[in-house]
Amino acid sequence: MHGVNDPPLFIKDIKAGLKNLNVVFIVLEIGRVTKTKDGHEVRSCKVADRTGSITISVWDEIGGLIQTGDIIRLTRGYASMWKGCLTLYTGRGGELQKIGEFCMVYSEVPNFSEPNPDYRGQQNRVVQNEQKDKMNTSIFGTVGNGVQTGPESRGYPLQYGRSNGPGPISPQLPGEPSNQTVRTTISNARDPRRAFKR
């Protein structure tokens, strides 16, 4: 966390979740206005300092006052991920103060608001793990006291999933000979009926 009197933070040091940020930047581009459901105007502006660039989201009338080339000091801002991109916001009690025009050393690269594949990968892994957890949770399994329920609890191994051949998957009862032949299918996961035609 940074206080109001702390020296400005460089854009390269901004991370999602940081609050009370003080940043000095030059406005490079002003995006088109979008309106929220409740009537607020939002502009996304590309801003930069000497360490790189980032997108700042500016709300309502203040967004209409900002112009390309303005040098601005943001106080009490915060950073967050929006649609996989690091974005800067003014926050509650945050201020944007114009302190100059045009004369500032800056670099457009790296753009820290570019979609972050590492972040997207982390989000995808989280979603996949949640889906896996939901799939593993079924009406069978262990009860809170550790007792196994379902067909497995009676000593019958039950196969879940798809079979490799026609017909249903049926449990093999203990002591019975297997009447199913095991077929191994190798697939590249493409449906041959949907082959690309040139």
Swiss-Prot record:
SUPFAM superfamilies: Nucleic acid-binding proteins. Residues 26-89 bind DNA. It is found in: Nucleus. Residues 142-198 are annotated as: Disordered. The keyword Nucleus applies. GO terms for cellular component: chromosome, telomeric region; nucleus; site of double-strand break; SOSS complex. Keywords: DNA damage, DNA repair, DNA-binding, Nucleus. GO terms for molecular function: DNA binding; RNA binding; single-stranded DNA binding. Residues 142-151, 177-188 have a biased composition (Polar residues). One of its GO terms (biological process) is response to ionizing radiation. Component of the SOSS complex, composed of SOSS-B (SOSS-B1/NABP2 or SOSS-B2/NABP1), SOSS-A/INTS3 and SOSS-C/INIP. SOSS complexes containing SOSS-B1/NABP2 are more abundant than complexes containing SOSS-B2/NABP1. Belongs to the SOSS-B family. SOSS-B2 subfamily. Component of the SOSS complex, a multiprotein complex that functions downstream of the MRN complex to promote DNA repair and G2/M checkpoint. In the SOSS complex, acts as a sensor of single-stranded DNA that binds to single-stranded DNA, in particular to polypyrimidines. The SOSS complex associates with DNA lesions and influences diverse endpoints in the cellular DNA damage response including cell-cycle checkpoint activation, recombinational repair and maintenance of genomic stability. This is SOSS complex subunit B2. It comes from Rattus norvegicus. The lineage of its organism: Eukaryota, Metazoa, Chordata, Craniata, Vertebrata.
